[in-house]
């Protein structure tokens, strides 16, 4: 996803939305009809079916990934406290699809008992998450109306005393916490929660605290084989919507504005019962025109080069796709050769990053070697690829930023691992002879998966030809 900000006044928003319905009603209706014909209205099944699949992913993640990662980082016991609506970033990797927030205060405790017994999982507050955790509740019984007496939930400072009891029973040599100055995904423990916990546990236990660092990062990044199977379908859906958006079913040259296309793309997801993790964006490049001359929300004209950035969110998993399109001029039957060459150049840069992205290498190492090959082949480009999964800009080793091509300290020093996904995001700029050697930017983004053996695969495929508006 590119960082892009468009500020629209309410009047501009209403005008943009009105233009879809009043200026090009037939195109919009056709787009909706075509999309409905080609994509089921429940592309991933009912919510219940989706939740059952997600619950299986959670169980496998806890049974398979968590023990391996705790041992990889030498973590005996991991404590993850959080309060309702102030959840740790790793929350998404720890809970069932029917859990949307922490319960009052929830303290998850993970204790590695060794390869034979596995990892003990406790929930001090909150529920068992479909049998994944053993919950602890308060001792007192309270009257619950017609249900009679019911065991109370853990509440307030007493929860820390229950945690202290758990620690005293298990006597871990160290206690890993989510505090980090490097990784946002490993820095989920709030200052208030830290203070309350430290005060209740006392100095003897506080001395055993240590940062969890890579554990929450890699747990968030770790993908299950069935998630990979699902991701192909999710990526296909993103492609389907982009293909329709960059066609005459949505775009009428000389009438449709880029904001019309953006809102159509977002609305299409809402109509399917899905969501996105960022506002879709569309931009144009035009022969002889600068960005300033085009303005914030230009009308799409014949001869324009189109670019979009689009993400789908489904079953808590995210896609991130950037594609190129072209609006044929009157009498044109194909994309000018110079523009085709520009797309081919960015495809070549994709090849390079695809080949360099390997488990065991740091993000900065991947960036450096990719840029060296890029320079040796005379490509004028930038690389800013990132992990993706439970978050759009996901946990794991960062491979460049658009404005930090020398490397990213900290985040870029983390290592790529097997069983994770990336968005290969980059751009190559080329001179286009048909445009009087104007510089044209071909920006592409496609998602890839890395399997358990470290092999890299496109999540579905990658764009090698322009989408055409005729």
What are these regions (language model features)?
Residues 24-470:
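Active-site neighborhoods and metal-handling regions in enzymes and metal-associated proteins
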Residues 8-16:
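Bacterial N-terminal signal peptides
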Residues 3, 15, 451:
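Ser/Thr-centric signal marking residues that sit
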Residues 1-9:
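Bacterial N-terminal signal peptides that target proteins for export
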Residues 18-20:
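Bacterial signal peptide processing site
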């Amino acid at each position: 996803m590119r960082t892009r900000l468009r500020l629209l006044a309410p009047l501009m928003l209403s005008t943009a939305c009105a233009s879809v319905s009043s200026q090009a009603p037939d195109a919009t209706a056709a787009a909706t009809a075509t999309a409905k014909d080609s994509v089921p209205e429940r592309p991933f099944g009912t919510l219940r079916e989706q939740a059952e699949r997600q619950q299986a992913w959670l169980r496998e993640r806890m049974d398979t990934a968590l023990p391996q990662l705790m041992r990889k980082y030498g973590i005996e016991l991991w404590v993850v406290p959080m309060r309702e609506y102030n959840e740790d970033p790793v929350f998404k990797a720890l809970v069932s699809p029917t859990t949307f927030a922490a319960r009052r205060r929830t303290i998850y405790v993970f204790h590695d008992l060794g390869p034979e017994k596995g990892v003990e999982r406790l929930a001090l507050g909150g529920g068992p998450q479909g049998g994944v955790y053993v919950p602890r509740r308060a001792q007192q019984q309270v009257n619950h109306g017609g249900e009679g007496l019911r065991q109370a939930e853990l509440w307030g400072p007493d929860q820390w005393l229950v945690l202290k009891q758990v620690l005293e029973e298990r006597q871990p040599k160290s206690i890993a916490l989510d505090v980090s100055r490097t990784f946002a995904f490993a820095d989920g423990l709030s200052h208030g929660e830290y203070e309350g916990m430290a005060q209740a546990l006392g100095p003897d236990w506080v001395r055993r605290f240590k940062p969890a660092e890579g554990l929450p990062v890699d747990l968030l990044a770790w993908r299950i084989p069935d998630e990979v199977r699902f991701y192909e379908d999710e990526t296909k859906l993103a492609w389907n919507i982009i293909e329709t958006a960059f066609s005459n079913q949505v775009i009428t040259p000389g009438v449709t504005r880029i904001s019309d296309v953006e809102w159509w793309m977002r609305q299409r997801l809402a109509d399917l019962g899905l969501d996105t993790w960022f506002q879709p964006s569309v931009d144009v490049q035009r022969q002889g025109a600068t960005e300033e001359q085009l303005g914030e929300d230009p009308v799409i004209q014949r001869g324009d080069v189109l670019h979009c950035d689009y993400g789908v969110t489904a079953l808590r998993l995210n896609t991130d796709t950037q594609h190129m399109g072209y609006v044929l001029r009157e009498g044109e039957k194909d994309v000018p050769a110079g523009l085709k060459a520009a797309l081919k150049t960015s495809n070549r840069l994709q090849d390079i990053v695809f080949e360099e992205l390997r488990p065991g290498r740091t993000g900065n190492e991947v960036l450096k070697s990719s840029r060296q090959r890029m320079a040796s082949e005379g490509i004028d480009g930038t690389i800013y690829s990132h992990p993706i999964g439970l978050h759009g800009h996901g946990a794991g080793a960062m491979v460049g930023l658009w404005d930090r091509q020398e490397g990213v300290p900290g985040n870029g020093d983390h290592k790529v691992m097997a069983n994770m996904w990336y968005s290969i995001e980059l751009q190559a700029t080329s001179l286009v002879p048909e445009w009087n050697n104007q510089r044209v930017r071909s920006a592409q983004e496609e998602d890839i998966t890395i399997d358990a053996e470290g092999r890299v695969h496109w999540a579905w495929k990658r764009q090698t030809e322009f989408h055409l508006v005729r």
